[in-house]
């Protein structure tokens, strides 16, 4: 029986850059009559492929498996992540083996099959299945990975709880919808089929929520960029790799949240080259947010060819505050609701409140009422909660 434990141990004694080569060499020597396919492609999501019933897979005890245990909070509980594992696979009448291991932030898979054709066909089947989703979300945070939790969150995102002007909502929705439905118009007039939208304004007013709702509306793949750094690679190479992945996903959305803190001076030149360079970005809609427009380099904020549309997401105005408060309190039992006069007073007193502060105001009122349970007291509770939330400098 092959000693997989020794193979793994000896390979991991090498320099990190040599580990894939060493493992591939040892496995090839071990199975001279078979083919070894090596991949680091994040689309090779073998575990999910098997869970969906696309193949049968079971763990072999030839290798002492190393499984990391993670606590994901009360809601998700305990999760397990295989670090080193050897599996046997039955797929389309073929029997294969797969050695999965991890080196730093990268997953390494070695597929062992009877022929190169079978290994490649299996690899392509897994990758095609993984990427065959219009709503797939890919995150780059030093490596590319799927984010099923964010995919689920997008499906439940709506505009109902956003405290935004209706006209602003409509304009944002129109920009995204019209981009993905107007490819022929762009081509007819010789325009590059790419756009950039920048949302800016103080925190707590729904930029992130609006982004999720726009992604849900578009129903397109999304690449969420959470880092432009890789300790083993240059900024230029990392950014080129991100844009290369985005172009493979097109038509798609590329999201840079809090772009002012994401992009440093060392990143700027490479990022601008990818946005403006020779490689075409057809089918890519770039979405970015910032809390501090003044901190964003003017090369990004003031060049229409990079972010064509800028939308200010500021503190809600009186009509939006009144509409939000009325809508939320209507969901309460009758005895918990404030009067029309109470809503009107609260609308005036919450000038300068962010959307998040209004959300907190409603929650605070509910908690206070449940504690005291005095019918008809919500007008008074509203005033008290507003004072408690009011920024000190505004009092």
Predicted regions, residues:
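Hydrophobic side chains in well-ordered alpha-helices
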Residues: 118-126, 210, 324, 361
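C-terminal alpha-helical "lid" subdomain
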Residues: 303, 314-395
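Generic structural signal for secondary-structure transition and capping sites
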Residues: 131, 181-184, 251, 280, ...
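Residues at alpha-helix boundaries and the short loops/turns that link adjacent helices
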Residues: 14-17, 249, 265, 352, ...
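Walker A/P-loop NTP-binding motif of AAA+ ATPase domains
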Residues: 159-341
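Secondary-structure boundary motif
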Residues: 29, 128, 248, 277-280, ...
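AAA+ P-loop ATPase mechanoenzymes
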Residues: 1-181, 231
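Amphipathic alpha-helical interaction elements
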Residues: 111, 164, 276, 367-374
């Amino acid at each position: 029986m092959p000693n997989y434990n020794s193979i793994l141990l000896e390979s991991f004694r090498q320099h990190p850059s040599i580990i894939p080569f060493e493992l591939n060499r040892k496995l090839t020597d071990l199975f001279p009559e078979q083919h070894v396919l090596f991949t680091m492609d994040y689309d090779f999501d073998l575990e999910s492929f098997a869970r969906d019933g696309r193949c049968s897979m079971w763990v072999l005890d030839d290798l002492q498996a190393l499984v990391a245990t993670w606590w994901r909070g009360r809601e998700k509980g305990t999760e397990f992540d295989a670090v080193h594992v050897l599996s046997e696979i039955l797929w389309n009448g073929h029997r294969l083996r797969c050695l999965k291991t991890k080196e730093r932030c990268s997953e390494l898979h070695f597929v062992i099959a009877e022929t190169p054709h079978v290994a490649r066909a299996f690899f392509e089947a897994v990758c095609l299945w993984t990427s065959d989703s219009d709503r797939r979300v890919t995150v780059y945070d030093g490596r590319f990975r799927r984010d099923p939790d964010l995919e689920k969150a997008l499906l439940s995102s709506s505009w109902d709880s956003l405290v935004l002007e209706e006209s602003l909502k409509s304009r944002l929705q129109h920009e995204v919808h019209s981009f993905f439905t107007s490819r022929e118009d762009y081509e007819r007039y010789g325009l590059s089929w790419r756009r950039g939208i920048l949302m800016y304004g103080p925190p707590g007013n729904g930029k992130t929520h609006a982004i999720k709702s726009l992604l849900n509306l578009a129903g397109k793949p999304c690449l969420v960029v959470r880092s432009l750094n890789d300790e083993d690679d240059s900024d230029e190479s990392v950014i080129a790799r991100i844009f290369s992945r985005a172009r493979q996903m097109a038509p798609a959305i590329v999201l840079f949240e809090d772009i002012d803190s994401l992009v440093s001076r060392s990143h700027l030149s490479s990022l601008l080259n990818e946005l403006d360079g020779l490689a075409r970005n057809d089918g890519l809609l770039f979405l970015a947010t910032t809390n501090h427009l003044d901190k964003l380099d003017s090369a990004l904020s003031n060049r229409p060819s990079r972010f064509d549309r800028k939308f200010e997401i500021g503190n809600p105005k009186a009509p939006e505050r009144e509409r939000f408060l009325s809508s939320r309190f209507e969901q309460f039992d009758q005895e918990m609701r404030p009067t029309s006069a109470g809503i009107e007073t609260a609308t005036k007193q919450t000038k300068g409140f962010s959307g998040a502060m209004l959300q907190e105001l409603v929650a605070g009122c509910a908690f206070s009422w449940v504690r005291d349970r005095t019918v008809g007291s919500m007008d008074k509770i509203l005033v008290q909660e507003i004072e408690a939330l009011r920024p000190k400098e505004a009092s």
